[in-house]
Amino acid sequence: MKMSISTHLPRILDTLNRNNINLFSALSLTSIVYNNFGEFLSNKQSYSANNPLLKYQIIILKDKNKTKDVEEKKSLFKREIAELVSRNFKLEGEKVKKYFDNLKEILKSLKYTIVDFEITTRTRALIGVSTSLGKLIFDSGISFDPYMNLPYIPASEIKGIVRSYIEDKLGEQDAEEIFGNEEMEGNVNFTDAYPTRPENFLFVPDVITPHYNKKKSEADAEPKPAIHLTIAPKVSFRFLIYYKREDVGKPICDSLPLVIMKGLGARSSVGYSLFELSKIEVIR
């Protein structure tokens, strides 16, 4: 027997209302409901007094919102999910510390020089907007590690912006000597960056109003605000770089603070995804 989509929602909201939620599972389940939103709204039991959804005070079931159209209700649903995630998702910092401590011991045994970086968001950050998790609901995805149950900044993204900066400053030949190319392995390695400590929340909801189509006049335009999740300001991320040739480390250590201030992630040109270097430790 096919189960109504509305029966999934109590389980989803219960998951989102708990501390230490598994965000990957919660957003994946929520996407099912969002993708079948019409079925949920058309179900006769949706507004029943006996519906277990009502105990969660879900915003689309409140009397003042029952007359809104489907798109307005979807927007309210997005907002509530974003607020639940922001309020209840907690960082498991000890797991991240253990991961980096173990990795550092392995790298030291292999005679690598290690640089331990901590960077902190100065603004709200958008990382991995083209990835699938959360994209169906919020129109932008989140780079997320289901094993660590944490958002992360991919090593490839950090390496890419540092390489681009060094190419501009030192030239392509020096950049290839450090980072390699299709035919030659590079002399420096990066890890993914994981959050270690937020000042308050790890995620915060945000609203972006898209620009109207240039073919329309401003008076005719009806831009619809897009609700999505962002990494909160003042969240610290940690990552390592490691190498065996000392001459490749200095250009990276010199350039990285400048690079991250210009932005690491999406929409940096309009004030998102700006970071600052908060800690650096070199281990030889």
Curated annotation (Swiss-Prot):
Protein name: CRISPR system CMR subunit Cmr6
Naturally occurring in which organism (per UniProt): Saccharolobus solfataricus (strain ATCC 35092 / DSM 1617 / JCM 11322 / P2)
GO CC annotation terms, alphabetical: cytoplasm
Similarity annotation: Belongs to the CRISPR system Cmr6 family.
InterPro entries per the UniProt record, alphabetical: CRISPR-assoc_prot_TM1791, RAMP_III_fam
Pfam families: RAMPs
Main location: cytoplasm
Function: CRISPR (clustered regularly interspaced short palindromic repeat) is an adaptive immune system that provides protection against mobile genetic elements (viruses, transposable elements and conjugative plasmids). CRISPR clusters contain spacers, sequences complementary to antecedent mobile elements, and target invading nucleic acids. CRISPR clusters are transcribed and processed into CRISPR RNA (crRNA). The CMR complex degrades RNA complementary to the crRNA (target RNA) within UA dinucleotides, generating 3'-OH and 5'-phosphate ends.
Subcellular location: Cytoplasm
Assembly behavior: Part of the CMR ribonucleoprotein complex, consisting of crRNA plus Cmr1/Cmr2/Cmr3/Cmr4/Cmr5/Cmr6 at 1:1 and possibly 3 Cmr7 dimers. A Cmr2/Cmr3/Cmr7 subcomplex without crRNA can also be isolated. It does not cleave target RNA.
Any single GO BP term: defense response to virus
The encoding gene: cmr6
Keywords: Antiviral defense, Cytoplasm
